[in-house]
Regions:
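Active-site-proximal or metal-binding-adjacent scaffold patches in catalytic folds
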Residues: 1-121, 131-168
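Walker B beta-strand of ABC/ABC-like P-loop ATPase nucleotide-binding domains
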Residues: 124
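Walker B catalytic acidic pair
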Residues: 127
């Protein structure tokens, strides 16, 4: 899954993994670059052996990327929906894509960053709607629909494709 040359989905595009061998067997340096052909590349530089080190490094980078994306999206949609948020956390959750606590703490699954942007937007709006309605009542779905009139299609896409992303 995280092998050299493997392409991973990333938002509306893809990112290719690239392992660069060095003599350093203690550290992995990870950075993103764009090739001349505009291809996104996630470079992992190390002399370490074993795919698990590279998998962990790639996931660490993806989580940081997801955090930055969620922070931008939450700011944008929270302002639009006129709600406040306390804290944003990005985690690996087995059964949830997001959650919202009574205190306004939002949790998001980092694997959402692999999905199309419109799906990330849907989950963000869904969780922010809980700042007004801490349930899934008709009033809750009306809050979601005010921001995303096509939320049903996005919700359906997530339901149909979520198993594909569980393997990452």
């Amino acid at each position: 899954m995280y092998d050299d040359g493997k392409e991973l989905p990333l938002g509306d595009g893809k990112i290719r993994l690239c392992r660069i061998k060095t003599r350093d067997k203690e550290h992995i340096r990870v950075y993103r670059k764009q090739s001349q052909s505009k291809e996104q590349i996630l470079c992992m530089v190390s002399g370490m052996e074993g795919g698990e080190f590279y998998r962990a490094a790639a996931i660490r980078w993806l989580r940081e990327y997801a955090r930055a994306e969620f922070e931008k999206k939450v700011r944008f949609y929270a302002d639009k929906m006129q709600v406040s948020v306390n804290r944003i956390a990005v985690k690996e959750q087995k059964t949830r894509w997001g959650s919202c606590s009574m205190k306004g703490n939002l949790n998001f699954n980092w694997k959402l960053a692999l999905m199309p942007e419109r799906i990330m937007d849907y989950v963000v709006v869904h969780e922010l709607a809980h700042r007004k309605q801490m349930n899934h009542s008709a009033a809750f779905w009306k809050e979601v629909e005010l921001v995303l009139p096509d939320y049903r299609e996005r919700k359906q896409w997530l339901s149909e494709h979520e198993k594909e992303f569980a393997e990452y």
